[in-house]
């Protein structure tokens, strides 16, 4: 049987790592014994907390050339967010909950994208549809991914399907959703021990928006001001990365996971467009965004709209 590489996006978050591991288990249950989960970056503190809690080993870092290899993408589809050699691979499946952009294949494939808050929610539905066993550690990974992507069900991306999935899984995983979720989110919200470069790259994605390449990074915290006290450090890193990677715009979204608000820091020639997108005035490159917590639903579409007019 041909080996199958399964992975989420670069700078993986909890959903990207968890969904790769979950999909590998799903494929094993279909009889694809050569399916294996990989990762395209370092494990975050939040994700490591979940892996340790449910006693699951982290996926291996992908270093292989994917030319001619069978792959399954989870939690992403845009090639600039994927493995460097993805255009040479044979994409068999995609399981995702994001917009579809910069994606094409030479042959047909199984593509499942749903407007839910988390890729793991789709995978939960797939297990139920096939009558596959959901082991406690798989249930735990599903819950962790859902809580992470939905910020404990507070994000506007969170749907009834996400909540219902987590509720159905909690007894299998033997966790209290509120207590476990808050502990996991707080594990990932510590920033004082991390460099500005680490924070800016921890959860960052690149997007093609019309003629512009935009980089959007997000940092979750319990104290926005503590993070942005290091504004000059962040600006230096963001400007250097923009020059090296040819980003037209770099947006750092610092999100308060307790109060569900964010502040943004923006660099780039088109930064005034970001103020226009959110109908705010940038003050020294920064602005407060009340109620904004979701990059996918509350940041990317708004900036895309002003950059493609």
Curated annotation (Swiss-Prot):
Mn(2+) 2 binds at residues 15, 75, 97, 149. It holds the Pfam family DHHA2. The keyword Nucleotidyltransferase does not apply. Its EC number is 3.6.1.1. It comes from the Bacteria. Its main location: cytoplasm. It catalyses: diphosphate + H2O = 2 phosphate + H(+). Its cofactor is Mn(2+). Gene3D superfamilies: DHHA2 domain, inorganic pyrophosphatase (n-terminal core). One of its GO terms (molecular function) is manganese ion binding. InterPro entries: DDH_dom (IPR001667), DHH_sf (IPR038763), DHHA2 (IPR004097), DHHA2_dom_sf (IPR038222), Mn-dep_inorganic_PyrPase (IPR022934). Binds 2 manganese ions per subunit. Keywords: Cytoplasm, Hydrolase, Manganese, Metal-binding. It is found in: Cytoplasm. Mn(2+) 1 binds at residues 9, 13, 75. GO terms for cellular component: cytoplasm. Belongs to the PPase class C family. This is Probable manganese-dependent inorganic pyrophosphatase. It comes from Staphylococcus epidermidis (strain ATCC 12228 / FDA PCI 1200).
């Amino acid at each position: 049987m041909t080996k199958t590489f399964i992975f989420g996006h670069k700078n993986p978050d909890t959903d990207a790592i968890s969904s790769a591991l979950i999909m590998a288990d799903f494929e094993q249950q279909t009889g694809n014994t050569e399916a294996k989960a990989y990762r395209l970056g370092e494990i975050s503190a939040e994700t490591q907390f979940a892996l340790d809690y449910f006693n699951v080993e982290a996926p291996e870092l992908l270093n292989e050339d994917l030319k001619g290899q069978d792959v399954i993408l989870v939690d992403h589809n845009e090639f600039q967010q994927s493995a460097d050699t993805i255009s040479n691979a044979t994409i068999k499946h995609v399981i995702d909950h994001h917009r579809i952009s910069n994606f094409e294949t030479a042959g047909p494939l199984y593509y499942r994208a749903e407007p839910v808050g988390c890729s793991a929610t789709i995978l939960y539905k797939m297990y139920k549809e096939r009558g596959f066993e959901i082991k406690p550690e798989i249930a735990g990974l599903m819950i962790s991914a859902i809580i992470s992507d939905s910020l404990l069900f507070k994000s506007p991306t969170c749907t009834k399907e996400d909540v219902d999935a987590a509720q159905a899984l909690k007894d299998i995983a033997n966790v209290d959703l509120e207590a476990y979720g808050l502990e996991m989110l707080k594990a990932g919200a510590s920033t004082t021990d991390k460099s500005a470069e680490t924070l800016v790259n921890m959860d960052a994605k690149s997007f093609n928006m019309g003629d512009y390449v935009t980089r959007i990074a997000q940092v979750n915290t319990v104290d926005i001001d503590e993070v942005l006290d290091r504004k000059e450090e962040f600006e230096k890193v963001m400007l250097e990365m923009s020059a090296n990677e040819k980003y037209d715009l770099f947006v750092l979204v610092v999100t308060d996971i307790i109060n569900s608000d964010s502040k943004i820091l923006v660099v780039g020639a088109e930064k005034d467009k970001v103020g226009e997108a959110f109908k705010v005035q940038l003050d020294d490159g920064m602005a407060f965004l009340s109620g904004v917590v979701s990059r996918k639903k509350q940041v990317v579409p708004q900036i895309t709209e002003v950059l493609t007019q």
